[in-house]
Amino acid sequence: MSKSDADLVLMARQGDQAAIGEIYDRYADRLFGFAFSMLRDREEAADAVHDVILRSSQKLDQLRDPSKLRPWLFSIARNEVTSRTRQRSRRDDREVPDMAADLPDSDNSLIQNELQQLVWDAADGLQQRDRELLELQMQGLEGEELAEALGVKLSHVHVLSSRMRDRMEKAVGSLLIARLGREDCDKLNELLSDWDGHFSLEVRSNVTRHIEDFYICTNKRGILCAP
């Protein structure tokens, strides 16, 4: 029978190194997924996870409720990612993970992978807080756990989630227009003449404003984003 998070915390507090190892085994992959989605660098994400586990093992006595280990770890991870992001003098080139080798031979899987990549790419056009919220939800956090990880009240999580979803939908639509709408709109083509393909916050804002001002792109976004 597997031990609960609370059991592992209590054992680790008593110096049980095996318990710390179990905490690592249980959460390292999910913490890495969060860190990589924010940092876009595998090596730096791995370093971040190492620091999160090390820091958390040193501060276990500060965890008031041992059953809340998961949101507490993600809260530490969020702070670690924010710190590393601020230390960067410029954005690193994004490393896109090689998913193709892991895909089963199925059209549905290929389509699902393309949709996931589209969402991932569009998320680059969001503010960091929205990206953090999106990734924490993808890691399975919700309700009180999500509030704990974000450091906000539970009632505020619902507001943040609703706003993030709205901005995410607009970001996906804007990315699709940026990729597929230039042939139909000279103004859009001119706007994106120097675009390198990375969907940054600035690009998203510019394209979104353009869509609102030009009917041809508004209409095309509606077609591309139709259910």
Give short role names for the model-derived ranges.
Residues K3, R13-E22, F32-D51, D61-R64, ...:
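Short, charged helix-capping/linker segments at alpha-helix termini
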Residues L8-M11, L118-L126, W195-H198:
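Short amphipathic alpha-helical boundary/capping segments
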Residues Y24, L126-E142, R204-V207:
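Short amphipathic alpha helix immediately N-terminal
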Residues S37, Q58-D65, F74-V96, D105, ...:
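Arg/Lys-rich amphipathic alpha helix in sigma70-family domain 2
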Residues V52, I76, L133-L134, L146-A147, ...:
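Hydrophobic positions on the alpha-helical face of helix-turn-helix-like DNA-binding modules
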Residues N113, A123-R131, C185-D186, S200-L201:
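Short helix-coil-helix linker/hinge
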Residues L136-H156, L191:
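Helix-turn-helix DNA-binding module
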Residues R179-H210:
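Short, amphipathic alpha-helical interaction patch
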